[in-house]
């Protein structure tokens, strides 16, 4: 049985090095691996001894914490219906029969959409308070940066198409978007911002060189969106440090997207994650491979901020945006005609929807290398609910 356990854990640890995979599981034996310190010797007394003091029971460890999520499995967390203008019909041939001025409930194209890519990279300082070489209470303080990419439907990219309102009356018409642009890609990069986490880990059961342990962790960060890219044929644009409207319904203010826009706020993403895990390790001299399972819930909430396409407040060369014409079977009409704006996408906007975990359970495999019972380096890979890699280097005082 011991040989089988050794084989399984060694294979898992070696496999973790061959594939790259926000919160690590960590080695369940970590509280008891470093039993000596660089400044103070470890204490191996009996906790029930009346002569033992808390000074004998407590020790400190510090080190580096690096966590690199290459693909977090996320989906949108939105309502089934979305409020916007009525959809154009086959009877709207030379422009809309009636320009949309009121919102109607339509099926939400963002409902249940999966994100194509979600990355997060964290570098932090690691501090742990150890009790009786069995329990750890720890925290991390550092910085994180992220990247999100998905189909434009996940971000409710919409615009107005086919309007018959002339440009001279457009600013006062209070029209709402009627077309969902679902065949495009939206990506965003966040800035590098402060991140922190807290947690606890306990070695619950030991038998020879095997250790069964559990941990609980919570992490939080609130990065701002540094750059937003919309890759769409009908309306392609990039915004550095985007701003938008929180809680605003259509129609947005006609100044939305211009430098004169008011009532906007910086686009930021509130990241929260909870995680509980159970893991088993087996010590083989300097190496302690382990394998674990975890349950986690993560959310990315940007307050459903609505961001408008950048545009000019006043037309220059008869245009306010660089959106192309979409002639289709018709033709591009001259300025001053009834449907002069019908062939270009107007009042384009998107919103940053709330996202959450698509899968809650995952596995982690890794190994810890201990030197002189004072220093340790842990390498870990996580799979199923995310592809992530983790590195932790620490020493005991």
Swiss-Prot record:
Q: Which UniProt keywords apply?
A: Cell outer membrane, Cell shape, Disulfide bond, Ion transport, Membrane, Porin, Signal, Transmembrane, Transmembrane beta strand, Transport
**Single Gene Ontology BP annotation:** monoatomic ion transport
InterPro entries for the chain: Major_OMP_Chlamydia
Quick one: a GO cellular component term? cell outer membrane
Q: From what superkingdom does this record's organism come?
A: Bacteria
Give membrane topology per the record: Multi-pass membrane protein
Q: Does the keyword Ligase apply?
A: no
Q: Principal place where this protein is found?
A: membrane
Q: Which GO terms describe its molecular function?
A: porin activity; structural molecule activity
Signal sequence span per UniProt? 1-22
Transmembrane region positions?
A: none
Q: Does the keyword S-adenosyl-L-methionine apply?
A: no
- Provide the protein's localization: Cell outer membrane
Q: Which family does it belong to?
A: Belongs to the chlamydial porin (CP) (TC 1.B.2) family.
Q: So what does this one do?
A: In elementary bodies (EBs, the infectious stage, which is able to survive outside the host cell) provides the structural integrity of the outer envelope through disulfide cross-links with the small cysteine-rich protein and the large cysteine-rich periplasmic protein. It has been described in publications as the Sarkosyl-insoluble COMC (Chlamydia outer membrane complex), and serves as the functional equivalent of peptidoglycan.
Q: How does it assemble?
A: Part of a disulfide cross-linked outer membrane complex (COMC) composed of the major outer membrane porin (MOMP), the small cysteine-rich protein (OmcA) and the large cysteine-rich periplasmic protein (OmcB).
Q: What is this protein called?
A: Major outer membrane porin, serovar L3
């Amino acid at each position: 049985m011991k040989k089988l356990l050794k084989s399984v854990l060694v294979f898992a640890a070696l496999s973790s090095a061959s594939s790259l995979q926000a919160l690590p599981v960590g080695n369940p034996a970590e509280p008891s691996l470093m039993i000596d310190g660089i400044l103070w010797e470890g204490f191996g007394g009996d906790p029930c001894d009346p002569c033992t003091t808390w000074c004998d029971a407590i020790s400190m460890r510090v080190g580096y914490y690096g966590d690199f999520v290459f693909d977090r499995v996320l989906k949108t967390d939105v309502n089934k219906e979305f409020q916007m203008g009525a959809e154009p019909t086959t009877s709207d041939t030379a422009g809309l029969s009636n320009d949309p001025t009121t919102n109607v409930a339509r099926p939400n194209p963002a409902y249940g959409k999966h994100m194509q890519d979600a990355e997060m990279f964290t570098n932090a300082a690691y501090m742990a308070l150890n009790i009786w070489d069995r329990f750890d209470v720890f925290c991390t303080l550092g910085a994180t940066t992220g990247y999100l990419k998905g189909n434009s439907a996940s971000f409710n990219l919409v615009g107005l198409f086919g309007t018959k309102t002339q440009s001279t009356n457009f600013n006062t018409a209070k029209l709402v978007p009627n077309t969902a642009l679902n065949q495009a890609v939206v990506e965003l990069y966040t800035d590098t911002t402060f991140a922190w986490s807290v947690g606890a880990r306990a070695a619950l059961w030991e038998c020879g060189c095997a250790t069964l342990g559990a941990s609980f962790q919570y992490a939080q960060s609130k990065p701002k969106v540094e750059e937003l890219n919309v890759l769409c044929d009908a309306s392609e644009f990039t915004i550095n440090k985007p701003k938008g409207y929180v809680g605003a319904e259509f129609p947005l203010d006609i100044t939305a997207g211009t430098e004169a826009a008011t009532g906007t706020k910086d686009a930021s993403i509130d990241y929260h994650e909870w995680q509980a895990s159970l893991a088993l390790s087996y010590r083989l001299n300097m190496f302690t491979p382990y394998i674990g399972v975890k349950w986690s819930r993560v959310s990315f909430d940007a307050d459903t901020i609505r961001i408008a396409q950048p545009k000019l407040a006043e037309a220059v060369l008869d245009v306010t945006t660089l959106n192309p014409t979409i002639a289709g079977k018709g033709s591009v009409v001259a300025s001053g005609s009834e449907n002069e704006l019908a062939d270009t996408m107007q009042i384009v906007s998107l919103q940053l929807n709330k996202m959450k975990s698509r899968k809650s359970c995952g596995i982690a495999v890794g190994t810890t290398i201990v030197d002189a019972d004072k220093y340790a380096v842990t390498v870990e890979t996580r799979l199923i609910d995310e592809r992530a890699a983790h590195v932790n280097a620490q020493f005991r005082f």
